């Protein structure tokens, strides 16, 4: 029998993706799935694609229901995880997909999320230097944001190698509508989204901005300032992030590619594509993979790194499973796939 798992907030898109991955995981057993608005309903009524779990019934999101599990995944709206987490036994492995424990700076939390900062947990981006060792000994893990994962994996090796300047970083990233959650919003109606792209939270106000800056500043060893513009794209899932920065003197395209290759040559889920092959979201769907490609714009003196990932998998549920695998001592790739389902 595998580790007993609870998923809080399992009726949402990230929660549903967690259920899909848990059902196929040889070392995890779903003990309970909770959903405040769907308590008492069968999982199959909300997630008809989850045939193996269709008859299991959603429980209320109650700490007493979650406390018996060995592993608890929190897939709750931002600001709701802290209260639940405080009631769970210290022996349980808790992975929070929300933002409650990602930021180290309470002022940044107050500015971008509001309310009281709940604290900081071990940051669960395994591909960062030293992260696996910290994750392996932790029982509380904060899963990174989806945009943050794409931007950090694209640029962190360049900052670590001191190849780019810290004060001229521009990230423009398009995401599918599932990144906005499952609750009804007028701007997510099919008639509003189909055939249209829309920028939103422009001008440094998106809540992932301080998290991106936190990660890149850590890699650089000095403060990094980022201009981040998110775009809502007419597709259900996937992120394509175009990340640019100003190179330091003497840096060329070969140095950029070498830094990325050196950082990720042994990584199971980060793939630097062959030269001139550019990332596309469709190639990553359903997988825990990130696809990267880089270019050097000599005329504009800009480094360009493009990243593609599935926002629900490597950007959320898949990364949570990856973190749990590390913390539980399982092979890191257990229950996860590197290959997408395109076309």
Swiss-Prot record:
One of its GO terms (cellular component) is cytoplasm. Pathway: Amino-acid biosynthesis; L-arginine biosynthesis; N(2)-acetyl-L-ornithine from L-glutamate: step 3/4. InterPro entries: AGPR_AS, AGPR_type-1, NAD(P)-bd_dom_sf, NAGSA_dehydrogenase, Semialdehyde_DH_NAD-bd. It comes from the Bacteria. The active site is at 146. It catalyses: N-acetyl-L-glutamate 5-semialdehyde + phosphate + NADP(+) = N-acetyl-L-glutamyl 5-phosphate + NADPH + H(+). Pfam families: Semialdhyde_dh (PF01118), Semialdhyde_dhC_1 (PF22698). Keywords: Amino-acid biosynthesis, Arginine biosynthesis, Cytoplasm, NADP, Oxidoreductase. The keyword Cytoplasm applies. CDD domains: AGPR_1_actinobacAGPR_like (cd24148), AGPR_1_C (cd23934). One of its GO terms (molecular function) is NAD binding. It is found in: Cytoplasm. GO terms for biological process: L-arginine biosynthetic process. Its EC number is 1.2.1.38. Gene3D superfamilies: Dihydrodipicolinate Reductase, domain 2, NAD(P)-binding Rossmann-like Domain. Catalyzes the NADPH-dependent reduction of N-acetyl-5-glutamyl phosphate to yield N-acetyl-L-glutamate 5-semialdehyde. PANTHER family: N-ACETYL-GAMMA-GLUTAMYL-PHOSPHATE REDUCTASE, CHLOROPLASTIC-RELATED, N-ACETYL-GAMMA-GLUTAMYL-PHOSPHATE REDUCTASE, CHLOROPLASTIC-RELATED-RELATED. Belongs to the NAGSA dehydrogenase family. Type 1 subfamily. NCBIfam families: argC (TIGR01850). This is N-acetyl-gamma-glutamyl-phosphate reductase. The gene is argC.
